Amino acid sequence: MQGVMKVNKTHKILVTALTTCMLMVSGAFGTVADAAKKPVVAEGLQGISVKGSTDLPGHFFLSFAFSRNLIMLDGKGNIVWSKHEAEPKPGGHTGWWDFKKHKVKGKTYYSYHDQTGAYDNYGLLGYAPGERVILDEHFKEVKRITFEASGVTAKGAPLDGHDFLLIDLDHYILSGYLHDKVYNIPGYAQGSKVVYSYLQEVDHGKVVWDWKSIDYPELYGYTITEGDPRSNDFANQKTDAPDYVHFNAMRLDESGNLVCSFRHLNSILCLDRSKRKDQIVWKLSGRGDEFGLAENEKSSCQHYVTVDGGYLTLFDNNNRDKQTRITSYAVNTADKKAEVARFYYIPGKYSQACGSVQHLPGDLYVIGWGWAVNDNECMSVYNFATGKKLMSVTLDNPKNITYRCVYYE
């Protein structure tokens, strides 16, 4: 399934050097003129304030890392659907993650991840064991999904909440974090306990493909500590659960390969779904980068990736420099060449975890700020072509951080 991400000739015009493509926007984005609008929210729902609006015909989907809130906004910023539930255990951080829309054979479904609080999270704040909840077009629950039985998981084992791909109602790709002792880390012959990434594709109840990060010992050497100083503690001195890759996003490319983001590798990996072994097709960014990126072009603790035509677009948290960036790479996978095509940042904006970005027509960018450090803005819509911020959503309680804020038509 190896293929080339061809750069669209029309878009190629936009590809410039990093220094000219960078848009520093202190002062470039005017304040949104409208007075803050206070949407009517259901009792107990996370409070938000909206400034500005867009003409987008679809909806914004907001999910929260540490609370059980889901919010859908229209393009004007009005709440059109919401859901709230008290935490089963106060202070338990049992959030609803990754609220999204799916179109399958002409039918609309929605889904979110329910961190139920019933499973062990290995002491990791960034691991949310639970179940994927599927809703029909009327938001009625259709089914709940957990892992199927495989060589490493029991049927009903919890999923991780970072991402989920619905191919059909009975065909999907799942993600999870598993805890085990391994003996293939160079220099640790006595064995090390680790938390590793496990991906499982299920078609009508049958596991048709899976992937385990521990099958690729070279990845241990690529682990970075910018997001978690314990992530490479293979001696298990401070933790018996080093989260050494930290999977957080996946997309299918045009060849059917799975393009995945791994925060603690600072890297994007492409996985071949037609293979059981030697499944890694290529690595972009991080210590294992195969595309010749300069150090300042590499991502740092990125949380989101999209396959955007001929580009890979990242929400680069950039824990290294504490200045979050939006970066798009034009990638030629056949020749292992990549260049920075678009690069934006807003001075002072830093998200230490979570977050998302989508590039829409007209050079609009929908940005979910995740765990924003220095303000309570959780979502922005920017037109980088004109230097305008069209819409801004802020949290009444800034501690109740969003997981993702994404747009669907």
Locate each region found by the language model.
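Bacterial N-terminal signal peptides that target proteins for export
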Residues: K6-L18
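Sec-dependent signal peptide cleavage junction
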Residues: M24-K38
